[in-house]
Amino acid sequence: MFPTDPVSNLATLIRCPSVTPAEGGALTALESMLTPIGFKADRIVAREAGTPDIENLYARIGVGGPHLMFAGHTDVVPVGDEIAWSHPPFSAAIAEGEMYGRGAVDMKGGIACFVAAVARHIEKHGAPKGSISFLITGDEEGPAINGTVKLLEWAAAKGERWDACLVGEPTNPGGIGEMIKIGRRGSLSGRITVQGVQGHAAYPHLADNPVRSILQLAHALMDPPFDDGTENFQPSNLEVTTIDVGNAAVNVIPAKASAAFNVRFNDLWTAESLMTEIVARLDRAASAGALRPGRAPVKYEIVWNERPSHVFLTRNDALIESLSGAVEAVTGQQPRLSTTGGTSDARFIKDYCPVVEFGLVGKTMHMVDERVALADLETLTGIYETFIARWFDHAAA
């Protein structure tokens, strides 16, 4: 039986408790949908010291080009307070036209719809005019070390090449058809630490309060703005995400303070140029002494996250026009091409082929009572099916 019904496909996937790093049966369920319609599937377990082993799936139909990849993940975030859910989070319960369950939107729903779209395409037209592959990881919501990165490396090493990729992440803010993601901002994280001298709060002259120093440095990171944005990207933005002193006593000046930060940056910067700018800001602030009158310049240490994400923008007309045309044909609206939001595994795929993202409405992702409208599943399946036909026509032209 062809898996042409996205509702049935999604219910099967939701019932698999695949909270990162557990496979939970989700990849097995997906494989059982794909093999009857002609896909050959491989299961790859990726490993790295200090991280959980992760099971991934790569499935392909066809042997020649053009080659379209669909990428995504079956792992989901924890359910949170299960008692707060209206329906059990892995039950795939349907109520008032919506299916409830962890991963319904992010992003088992997108996978279920693309499976249905491919099955419908094959049922109507036979095998695709080239190849279609599914690159599905169980490590997107986690560290993202043993997932898409290693699956791409494995596939490329065995000779796989792709002409384009669609990632099925939820991209629409309020309704299906609003937004296609054609790029992503870069992401850079770090932590600065300042050593002080611990002492009694009543005798500050005998101590050196590192909180003053860390506030001075943190302010310099956030102000002034890094830029005003570009044609395709919003302004780069730095947020201080934690300030920690490890001190529970109200009458003790702490011995050290640290602050973590994250920058989402546009195409005016690279990770390297942004690091240089941040260090320059910290150096200037360290010598200013505004919050530390009469004290020596602040001495700080900075540690960078080992894996910054680089900014990218996809400019592949065949891919973008095929998808935007499919969205307009099915929904009647022209989607906005956007680079907003957080990072996704598209940041890894961009090094192998042009990539865009389009999926469900993301309003309830990661929330209690994550859910998707059944009508949206049918609409997205229709868009995906139309896109598949249009993309192969474009690619063959």
Curated annotation (Swiss-Prot):
It catalyses: N-succinyl-(2S,6S)-2,6-diaminopimelate + H2O = (2S,6S)-2,6-diaminopimelate + succinate. One of its GO terms (molecular function) is acetylornithine deacetylase activity. Zn(2+) 2 binds at residues 106, 141, 366. Pfam families: M20_dimer (PF07687), Peptidase_M20 (PF01546). Its EC number is 3.5.1.18. InterPro entries: ArgE/DapE_CS, Bact_exopeptidase_dim_dom, DapE_proteobac, Peptidase_M20, Peptidase_M20_dimer, Peptidase_M20A. One of its GO terms (biological process) is lysine biosynthetic process via diaminopimelate. Binds 2 Zn(2+) or Co(2+) ions per subunit. Pathway: Amino-acid biosynthesis; L-lysine biosynthesis via DAP pathway; LL-2,6-diaminopimelate from (S)-tetrahydrodipicolinate (succinylase route): step 3/3. Zn(2+) 1 binds at residues 73, 106, 169. It is an enzyme of class 3 (hydrolase). The active site is at residues 75, 140. Homodimer. This is Succinyl-diaminopimelate desuccinylase. It comes from Sinorhizobium medicae (strain WSM419). The gene is dapE.
